[in-house]
Curated annotation (Swiss-Prot):
Functional description taken from the UniProt entry: Excises uracil residues from the DNA which can arise as a result of misincorporation of dUMP residues by DNA polymerase or due to deamination of cytosine.
One MF term in the entry's GO annotations: uracil DNA N-glycosylase activity
EC number: 3.2.2.27
Protein name, per record: Uracil-DNA glycosylase 1
Gene Ontology BP term (one): base-excision repair, AP site formation via deaminated base removal
Length: 220
């Protein structure tokens, strides 16, 4: 199957695109776009892939579902466009960065500047019906994004994987810990951040690891 995606990802994921499950997934999602309000707009489904080539990835942040409210999600996990109110989880991420590294709290929740530096924030599920959280779970996206994680683990070295919350932590089994650093904590959601996300210092730990491997750190 021909999928429009950045060339370095195309090369490594074509095997997935050619599998029967992916064809079923694409047909299901196309049908959904035809009958319901689906997020993000179709051309933004692979936005994080198109913005961060395979060889540029330094830090992987794993999420679960896209934001279900129109105008928020545009293909980058946790991120929202300029001018959109910063969601609670992202606000807590910024608070932890402030506490950890002394960075001022930003006015925008747009994480494009992270992605340009090699941060790869990816949801496990890449589409959702508007206002219906989790509505596109178990249709094939998880199989695809698990393959992405495996490919990064196998073909890259010295990556940092940030796994927040029980769902993301389950993905640790896909990652080679001899080659990569895994950082785990509770989810930054307002419901859980006080129970171990605040104070996790993942952002300084990531930079310390990258520096120790001779890799330029992230300006969080």
């Amino acid at each position: 199957m021909n999928v429009k995606i950045e060339s370095s990802w195309q090369q490594r994921l074509q095997e997935e695109f050619d599998k029967p499950y992916f064809e079923k997934l694409v047909n299901f999602v196309k049908n959904e776009y035809g009958k319901a309000h689906i997020l993000p707009p179709g051309h933004q489904i692979f936005h994080v892939f198109n913005s961060c080539p395979f060889q540029n990835v330094k830090v992987v942040i794993l999420g679960q579902d896209p934001y279900p409210n129109p105008g928020q999600y545009y293909g980058i996990c946790f991120s929202v466009p300029d001018g959109v109110a910063i969601p609670g989880s992202l606000s807590n991420i910024f608070k932890e960065i402030h506490q950890d590294l002394g960075k001022p709290l930003p006015n925008s929740g747009n994480l494009d500047r992270w992605v340009k530096q090699g941060v790869f924030p990816m949801n496990s599920v890449l589409t959702v019906r508007a206002h219906e959280t989790g509505s596109h779970r178990n249709i094939g996206w998880e199989t695809f994004t698990d393959a992405v994680i495996k490919k990064l683990s196998e073909e890259r070295e010295n990556l940092v994987f940030m796994l927040w919350g029980s769902y993301a932590k389950e993905k640790a089994s896909l990652i080679d810990t001899d080659k990569h650093l895994i950082l785990t904590a509770v989810h930054p959601s307002p419901r859980s951040a006080d129970y171990g996300f605040f104070g996790c210092k993942h952002f300084s730990k990531a930079n310390t690891f990258l520096r120790s491997r001779g890799i330029e750190e992230i300006d969080w």
